[in-house]
Amino acid sequence: MLTVNLIMIAAICLTNFFYQYLDFMRVLKCTCSAIFTILGAINLVYAYKTKQSNMKFYVSMMAGLFFAFLGDVLIDWQFIPGAAVFALGHVFFVIAYGFIQKIKALDCAIGGSVFVACVIFLFSPLVTFDVPVFRIVCLVYSLIIASMLGKAIGNFVRDKNKTTATIAAASFLFFFSDLMLVCDWFIGVWDWAPNACMGTYFPALCLMAFSMFVKIVSDSNKAEKR
């Protein structure tokens, strides 16, 4: 199963390279998204077949991956529906993180600090919203992604293991990718922003899907030692 994960991750990275090299062909973007969604589904089935005890985590992660895929399809067509679907995917990721550890004060403190930084950035003169509702969408989205990052970091701080490390890394890349998306859409002066956005977005989703496999292996090893 590790081989399957690595092959599919390599396929995503290769497709992502050509997606950016060929001037962001939409079909290649959707292909990348489809692959990480399929990888998540494979790991979900593997978790079920190996009778993992915390199936709610895997189902929530799969839901997050699916809505990320759907958001990829929608956001190039309509920004607000696409962002809404992405936000829903992030909510499922936060829920999944909560099935690893319950929400603690540290998670809220980290997430709150990140959100405050996002608010300051979104109201700075650098960022221009031609349509006012876009600012509201970005603020709501920032609250969700900040909560996601805060929970991931909090989980890792309390319990440093391969699963929480993988998820924390994925969440950070996700946050950075979203930041670059805002820079590309609402600042638009950095030519490298689209590449930075997609260059970190798909690796983030790869790690999200891969974290499901990492947790399966980790929990199975713990069960064998008992």
Question: What are these language model-derived features?
Answer:
Residues 1-226:
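Polytopic alpha-helical membrane-helix bundles and their juxtamembrane interface segments
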